[in-house]
Amino acid sequence: MIKDRFLQLIQLLISLFLIMGALGIGITIQKFTGVSVPGSVIGMLVLFFSMTLGLVKVDWVKPGATLFIRYMILLFVPISVGLMQHFDMLLANALPIIASAVGGSLIVLVSLAWLLDYLLKEKH
């Protein structure tokens, strides 16, 4: 029982180390290259490609990822509080925000539909 808990803790720590390591690599790449893509996104891509190439196994990352997903709602609390503090600004800009969200979604939807149509026609 204690041995199992200790093993789970070690697996969780390894998982968190891999996730935070990918984040650190992403931030470092972003700082050295100066690209406008956030380091966290680059870190996610680093982790994704290392898992795709088989350098990192999914089971190694799963305990930490599950923990983050389980408590993800807590990460939205500061954002929600910030939005409520600036609600008047949010309300004043509601139309551009809604228009950009709907417009962006439509652009993505149409682009993916065209791409899928092209790829399916190419196979047949």
UniProtKB/Swiss-Prot annotation:
It is a multi-pass membrane protein. It is found in: Cell inner membrane. It comes from Vibrio parahaemolyticus serotype O3:K6 (strain RIMD 2210633). Pfam families: LrgA (PF03788). Its main location: membrane. This is UPF0299 membrane protein VP1300. Keywords: Cell inner membrane, Cell membrane, Membrane, Transmembrane, Transmembrane helix. The chain crosses the membrane at residues 9-29, 35-55, 72-92, 95-115. Belongs to the UPF0299 family. InterPro entries: LrgA/CidA (IPR005538), Uncharacterised_UPF0299 (IPR022957). GO terms for cellular component: plasma membrane.
